[in-house]
Amino acid sequence: MSKETNRRGNCTSGWSIPFSGSKKWVIFDPDMNATYWYCAVTRDPEDTTGFKFHGKFGHARYQAYNVYNDDTKDLIWGDDATHISALSDVNTVPDEGSNNPYQLAVPRDTREREYTVWVVPDGSDTSGYSNFITIPEDVEKLSIFLRVYLPTRTSKAGCVAKTELMYTNS
């Protein structure tokens, strides 16, 4: 975070309003059948601030977290295969006591469907995290997107708007 916005705690209000990928101003290859939320971040290279996303798997066909480098307009790690820049639904490990409805043999309407995703500076201790994406030290401007594809008609954008965003000190 830049010095003027460096804080800790709940920052759920930092999420954008949900928007459709059909909007012409949406960058990063939007899909018109998806609903998006994003959080734009400007940070100093030595910053140790990370982000914790806690929510429920959406009632939708697909969901994923993608982290982009705003300067290059590419995924945060580009073509570096040793790091991940995105976390898809099927690869997201559910919180203890919960189930991932995107995995085989799990009912889509499972009630316990919570997960936690961390986005933290590269070099942070991630040994206690099941789901994480690291931020390269040299990336100062990034956007974290949550994409929900084809939410069910009975759910409001897949019910992921309640995903809580927290600043953490990695």
Task: Label each residue range with its predicted role.
Residues 1-170:
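A compositional/structural signature for long, glycine/proline-rich flexible linkers
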